[in-house]
Amino acid sequence: MIFSSYQGRRLLRALAVSTVLIGGIGGATAAMAPAASAATCSDVDVVVARGTFEPGTLGIIVGDPQFSALQSALPGKTLSSYPVNYPADLGEPTSVQTGNRDLVNHVTTQAAACPSQRFILVGYSQGANVVDNSIGISSDGALVGGAIVATIPTSLTSRIAAILQFGNPIRAQGKSITGTFQARTDDFCADQDPVCQANGNNVLAHLSYGGNTAAAATFAAARV
């Protein structure tokens, strides 16, 4: 079934409650997550846009385990991380645009400060919309999507080593990342996840992406 905007928001609220409960149960693990830092010139800066209401340094469902998996997959590289500064909220109508602007500003500023640094962009759920917009793929009309307000400059596209997307809402519209970044993108949509699959009917599938982070890290490592 295809969700209306209202139904989709109710779904995400239910998922948010589940995510918070998982965060409480797995609090010890979340506390061990890497501290977010992008101040120094690491070889690779991992920029993460978390999901709606997702707790954790980078996000307990995807961001934190993804950063750890990337560290394991890139033992010869130094890595830093940056959590996109945005509400990740259903009650804020410009949440995605705020994240879109912050992600682009961060990459632009960081690239100027660290000329040899490369970037891996990670987006989960609403955060995937943030990443989509930032590379010029509009999430407007998708669940918790919005219009593009900023894009990564074309002069920096070669610095984007990989894009890792999880539960990307534009996929429920039949859209995907195409063009310049297509070959550098690994886009995971769990079977029956209603956020990214128009006929999906398993809300818990949207919480399953921690199991894909090792494969995503291998994909990204081959492109750094």
Please tell me what each predicted stretch does.
Residues 1-21, 30-32:
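N-terminal export and membrane-targeting signals
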Residues 185-186:
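Short amphipathic
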Residues 22-29, 124, 129-130, 213, ...:
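Hydrophobic alpha-helical membrane segments, chiefly transmembrane helices and signal peptide h-regions
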Residues 100-182, 195:
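Serine-dependent carboxylesterase/thioesterase catalytic core
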Residues 23-42, 142:
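C-terminal region of N-terminal signal peptides and the immediate post-cleavage residues
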